[in-house]
């Protein structure tokens, strides 16, 4: 392994996202796959991570604990579940390891734990690691500043049947981008469900609608609707590799950073636009 490479560990290696993260880590220049993890008791423990991901033998055996691979990685990439990610966060904070967190569904306490840990380690925490989605978020900020005060804003998202949280983290990030551009707190203006007799739409709110069906990788639309016209800004993902490549790119970007909380807009330098 070349000293210039950054070594990544992949949590949830046997999952759909984990396998593609392994592929991305093996393919990206400047990155080395240092470790792969699965839950204790998994039948995948001991298998070769590259073969598990369909990328050929990598010489990295899947392990069941971070302690077993403590000296084998610099940055952990975690797209698992909130409770597991927070356990990994505590370990990485204690041992000075960077993290790329793509897990969604954190409550306020979980988000605060991430902010606290970033005082000691470098973390990229994002709801979505695709370049396209992060450009979308920037476009939404611009659109909201121009027409957000007088249009009806709705966010519609669709994902595969196995997704366990709703609305998606990306949909919430879209809402936060719009609300922030309007100097609002999303908690004060979001409407997450409508059923029965709801009365007329409340001005200034941001509505959310969720679809869960089939194998949809991820589709997100923000609608700014006025009388006589509307603008729709949409992103559609057709492969999880776009997220995997973005996450591994983020791990590479963390090289040399000691601490701090960042997102994909930092990685892509979109905040300067």
Swiss-Prot record:
<dbReference type="Pfam" id="PF01113">
    <property type="entry name" value="DapB_N"/>
</dbReference>
<dbReference type="InterPro" id="IPR000846">
    <property type="entry name" value="DapB_N"/>
</dbReference>
<dbReference type="InterPro" id="IPR022664">
    <property type="entry name" value="DapB_N_CS"/>
</dbReference>
<dbReference type="GO" id="GO:0009089">
    <property type="term" value="P:lysine biosynthetic process via diaminopimelate"/>
</dbReference>
<protein>
    <recommendedName>
        <fullName>4-hydroxy-tetrahydrodipicolinate reductase</fullName>
        <ecNumber>1.17.1.8</ecNumber>
    </recommendedName>
</protein>
<feature type="binding site">
    <location>
        <begin position="169"/>
        <end position="170"/>
    </location>
    <ligand>
        <name>(S)-2,3,4,5-tetrahydrodipicolinate</name>
    </ligand>
</feature>
<feature type="binding site">
    <location>
        <begin position="12"/>
        <end position="17"/>
    </location>
    <ligand>
        <name>NAD(+)</name>
    </ligand>
</feature>
<comment type="subunit">
    <text>Homotetramer.</text>
</comment>
<dbReference type="GO" id="GO:0008839">
    <property type="term" value="F:4-hydroxy-tetrahydrodipicolinate reductase"/>
</dbReference>
<dbReference type="InterPro" id="IPR036291">
    <property type="entry name" value="NAD(P)-bd_dom_sf"/>
</dbReference>
<dbReference type="InterPro" id="IPR023940">
    <property type="entry name" value="DHDPR_bac"/>
</dbReference>
<keyword id="KW-0028">Amino-acid biosynthesis</keyword>
<keyword id="KW-0457">Lysine biosynthesis</keyword>
<dbReference type="InterPro" id="IPR022663">
    <property type="entry name" value="DapB_C"/>
</dbReference>
<keyword id="KW-0220">Diaminopimelate biosynthesis</keyword>
<keyword id="KW-0560">Oxidoreductase</keyword>
<keyword id="KW-0963">Cytoplasm</keyword>
<dbReference type="GO" id="GO:0019877">
    <property type="term" value="P:diaminopimelate biosynthetic process"/>
</dbReference>
<feature type="binding site">
    <location>
        <position position="38"/>
    </location>
    <ligand>
        <name>NAD(+)</name>
    </ligand>
</feature>
<dbReference type="GO" id="GO:0050661">
    <property type="term" value="F:NADP binding"/>
</dbReference>
<feature type="binding site">
    <location>
        <begin position="102"/>
        <end position="104"/>
    </location>
    <ligand>
        <name>NAD(+)</name>
    </ligand>
</feature>
<feature type="binding site">
    <location>
        <position position="160"/>
    </location>
    <ligand>
        <name>(S)-2,3,4,5-tetrahydrodipicolinate</name>
    </ligand>
</feature>
<feature type="binding site">
    <location>
        <begin position="126"/>
        <end position="129"/>
    </location>
    <ligand>
        <name>NAD(+)</name>
    </ligand>
</feature>
<feature type="active site" description="Proton donor/acceptor">
    <location>
        <position position="159"/>
    </location>
</feature>
<comment type="pathway">
    <text>Amino-acid biosynthesis; L-lysine biosynthesis via DAP pathway; (S)-tetrahydrodipicolinate from L-aspartate: step 4/4.</text>
</comment>
<comment type="similarity">
    <text>Belongs to the DapB family.</text>
</comment>
<dbReference type="GO" id="GO:0016726">
    <property type="term" value="F:oxidoreductase activity, acting on CH or CH2 groups, NAD or NADP as acceptor"/>
</dbReference>
<keyword id="KW-0521">NADP</keyword>
<keyword id="KW-0520">NAD</keyword>
<dbReference type="Pfam" id="PF05173">
    <property type="entry name" value="DapB_C"/>
</dbReference>
<feature type="active site" description="Proton donor">
    <location>
        <position position="163"/>
    </location>
</feature>
<dbReference type="GO" id="GO:0051287">
    <property type="term" value="F:NAD binding"/>
</dbReference>
<comment type="function">
    <text>Catalyzes the conversion of 4-hydroxy-tetrahydrodipicolinate (HTPA) to tetrahydrodipicolinate.</text>
</comment>
<dbReference type="GO" id="GO:0005829">
    <property type="term" value="C:cytosol"/>
</dbReference>
<feature type="binding site">
    <location>
        <position position="39"/>
    </location>
    <ligand>
        <name>NADP(+)</name>
    </ligand>
</feature>
